[in-house]
Amino acid sequence: MLTPETIDAFNTRLTVNLNTIKTMKPSQLDQVKSQGSNAEALLKNRDLALFIHQYKFELLDSLSAITGYTEEDNNKRVAISNQLAGIDGFVASLQRAVYMKNRVVTLQQEPTPNLKGNEVL
């Protein structure tokens, strides 16, 4: 069951896209960098990588073991495919968080030109 705390956490989550990075507050940028660093640590974790590969191999083995074409067999195929898509989506979200962190760091390191009047670069 969803609790009010869970709903509030979902509604106040930080959503980031490339168009809003330049307009974000410093606290939000720090949060993006923190989440990106955590995601990067997870992606570099060898145990997690081995677990994910083993999990996917087990799912593929169970998928190849389904030989029938009944409605129940088709439902099993769909369920296993959804599990594979879910784990791939999880890894993609980690990679996206790392990319956003790197993008924020790059934008913060770029020097801003000090232009006066109508100077042209």
Show the residue positions of the predicted features:
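Intrinsic-disorder/low-complexity detector
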Residues: 2-121
